[in-house]
């Protein structure tokens, strides 16, 4: 086994050992009093019940796709697909299991100090982060070694990761938002009870949803991004460089990224900063600096120049700036969110209008930055004289952006753990000071989640672009002629798909939320003593509604993302499929940014008012902001984040089925001719 494969697998194993150590640390902490443990037990059971049901359905999907791959593409690709799917499931399961233990321990720690609570919540998130990167590089390293570096087979691993990620993100998003919308509209607006009030029948489902969507779903999303970026770099690196330096560089860089993430996590955990945001930022910046310095040394050692370093640095810097810009559009410390809060004074309509405007504005700078990142990485690598080398540079920018994924996921998954801790504190009637600490941690979590979503969409654009280049190479497409009618048809259909996908997922949340609202209203009417706190609501019924709706509604969007590219390639040929991928990439990135940022801005405008601005809780402005937040929920937590996976999944499906499209593509064209 070549040394660079050994290094990458070893780094992955170290990440998994570190995750296990953090998990053990969390388990040893106190889980609080009996009431806290009872509530946490309900949340844990609900989350695990959902995962078991989801995985049961996904097993059937994995079997069907494996058989199709084995027959039409090859058993080797099918084997890689199975491993990618299983590892994606493992990453979600490990992360969710620990997150549902860390939440109650964070609430208990908040009774003692903010620092201790932050440490536990962040450690819980770090388990997810380390599981994602550890399983990612171990899986790719093993498959690369077993199949002798044949990337045609290893792309199957990416397909497995991507398809599970889409179902996890969509299913988790529908679950969490059905519960959230139901709990908010009936609980807050109609019944006038506060958030996380134990009298609300949907409150447990809402807290389960935080884990299902924002821990397992988000983890699977970034697992897929991480794996996809490495696979695209390896695929192009194999073509461009004869002596394996094109493969060696991304694998060793990913290994260094894991070590840098571990160091960053340790710094954040030991930080003495009073502001939780500063503590989290410390680790992120340290991890980023280690990767940039290492990339310079590595680039000079492997390639004898700094070209690869500049490509990697462009990706990492663009990712960090997009994260900061996302914060500026979604944090209540900046004018965009404050404007939405101001517009809430005149009712829900102006709240919605201003939120949509913020979402649209927020597409400008990320797209400009992604474009700069693409240009820099393409030309600095030598794309002017050799296009394939330039495209390899773009894939390195994606690897650079995702090199500290372990840290990104840790910071991102910390948010829902802190949110859950606040819910447990409220339901357990812990002192007001505890809720103040968890609220502070949660508000930082909202910002980190928004930054994470910005990072995810930026990396999705670069990863999909480099996978698209791999597809063009696999199907022997020299260029895509947009004056070609067939390509134009593909472009139109591709550009439409993110809107159709968004409509399906938004409608699914609406349907599921409707069921939830009816159930919560029924319980308020038919169970005497709920409002007085004398009777316990039927929490399980609401959990079951969310689970059933999420599983039912995730199937169509998921199947669509896989079937449409294959159908397009078979019916209209490789040029039309190339057009479809380009159209979906452009519109998917824009729709994803708009939805994620508009939703985040509405959410924080509501929190800004709850902090005392514009009349505070219970005011007319607050009621309007709650409506905005409710509309924004499926925007930012279901449809928006799903766009990243959609564009990457369609590209990797096309790459895996490229041999089939090359052999049988254009059936309809041949009939017409």
UniProtKB/Swiss-Prot annotation:
Q: Name the cofactor(s) required for activity, per the record.
A: Mg(2+)
Taken from the record, one Pfam family name reads H_PPase
Check the UniProt entry and state the signal peptide residues, or none.
none
Reactions mediated catalytically? Na(+)(in) + diphosphate + H2O = Na(+)(out) + 2 phosphate + H(+)
What's a BP term from Gene Ontology annotated to this protein?
sodium ion transport
Q: Which parts of the sequence are marked as the site Important for ion transport? A: 169, 214, 221, 637, 648
Which residue numbers mark the site Determinant of potassium dependence? 449
Write down what this protein is called. Putative K(+)-stimulated pyrophosphate-energized sodium pump
């Amino acid at each position: 086994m070549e040394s660079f494969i050994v290094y990458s697998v070893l780094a992955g194993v170290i990440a998994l050992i570190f995750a296990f150590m953090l998990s053990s640390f969390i388990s040893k902490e106190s889980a609080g009093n009996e009431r806290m443990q009872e509530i946490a037990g309900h949340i844990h059971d609900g989350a695990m019940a959902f995962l078991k049901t989801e995985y049961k359905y996904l097993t059937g999907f994995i079997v069907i796709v494996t058989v199709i791959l084995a027959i039409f593409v090859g058993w080797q690709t099918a084997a890689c697909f199975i491993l990618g799917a299983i590892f994606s499931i493992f990453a979600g399961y490990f992360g969710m299991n620990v997150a549902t233990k860390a939440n109650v321990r964070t609430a208990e720690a908040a009774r003692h100090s903010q620092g201790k609570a932050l440490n536990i919540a962040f450690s819980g998130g770090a388990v997810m982060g380390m599981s994602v990167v550890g399983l990612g590089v171990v899986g790719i390293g093993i498959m690369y070694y077993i199949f002798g570096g044949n990337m045609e087979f290893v792309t199957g691993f990416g397909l497995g990761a991507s398809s599970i990620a889409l179902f996890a993100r969509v299913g988790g998003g529908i679950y969490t938002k059905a519960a959230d919308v139901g709990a908010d509209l009936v609980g807050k607006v109609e019944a006038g009870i506060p958030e996380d009030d134990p009298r609300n029948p949907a409150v447990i489902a809402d807290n389960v949803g935080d884990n299902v969507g924002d821990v397992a779903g988000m983890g699977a999303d970034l697992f897929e991004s991480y794996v996809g970026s490495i696979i695209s770099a390896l695929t192009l690196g194999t073509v461009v460089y004869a002596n394996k330096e094109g493969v060696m560089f991304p694998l060793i860089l990913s290994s260094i990224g894991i070590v840098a993430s571990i160091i960053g996590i340790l710094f954040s955990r030991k930080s003495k900063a009073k502001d939780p945001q500063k503590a989290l930022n410390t680790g992120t910046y340290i991890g980023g600096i280690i990767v940039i310095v290492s990339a310079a040394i590595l680039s000079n050692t492997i390639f004898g120049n700094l070209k690869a370093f500049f490509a990697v640095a462009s990706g990492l810097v663009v990712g960090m700036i997009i994260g900061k810009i996302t914060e500026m559009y979604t944090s209540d410390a900046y004018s965009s969110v404050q404007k939405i809060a101001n517009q809430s004074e005149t009712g829900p309509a102006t709240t919605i209008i201003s939120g949509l405007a913020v979402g649209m504005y927020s597409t400008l700078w990320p797209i400009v930055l992604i474009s700069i990142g693409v240009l820099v990485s393409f030309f600095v690598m030598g794309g002017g004289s050799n296009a394939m080398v330039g495209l390899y540079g773009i894939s390195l920018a994606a690897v650079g952006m995702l090199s500290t994924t372990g840290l990104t996921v840790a910071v991102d998954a910390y948010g829902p753990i802190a949110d859950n801790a606040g819910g447990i504190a409220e339901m357990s009637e812990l002192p007001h000071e505890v809720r103040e600490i968890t609220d502070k941690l949660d508000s930082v979590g909202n910002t980190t989640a928004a930054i994470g979503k910005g990072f995810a969409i930026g990396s999705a654009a670069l990863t999909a672009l480099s996978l698209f280049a791999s597809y063009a190479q696999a199907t022997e497409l020299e260029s895509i002629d947009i004056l070609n009618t067939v390509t134009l048809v593909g472009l139109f259909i591709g550009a439409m798909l993110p809107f159709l996908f968004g409509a399906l997922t938004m409608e699914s949340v609406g349907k599921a939320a409707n069921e939830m609202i009816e159930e919560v209203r029924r319980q308020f009417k038919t169970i005497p003593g709920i409002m007085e706190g004398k009777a316990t609501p039927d929490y399980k019924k609401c959990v079951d509604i969310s689970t059933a709706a999420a599983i039912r509604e995730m199937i169509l969007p998921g199947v669509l993302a896989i079937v449409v590219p294959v159908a397009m390639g078979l019916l209209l040929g490789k040029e039309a499929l190339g057009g479809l991928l380009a159209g979906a990439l452009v519109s998917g990135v824009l729709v994803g940014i708009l939805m994620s940022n508009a939703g985040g801005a509405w959410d924080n405008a509501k929190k800004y008012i709850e902090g005392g601005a514009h009349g505070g809780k219970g005011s007319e402005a607050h009621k309007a902001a709650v409506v905005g937040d409710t509309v924004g929920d499926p925007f930012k937590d279901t449809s928006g984040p799903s766009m990243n996976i959609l564009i990457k999944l369609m590209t990797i499906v096309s790459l895996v089925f490229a041999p089939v499209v090359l052999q049988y593509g254009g059936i309809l064209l041949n009939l017409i001719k």
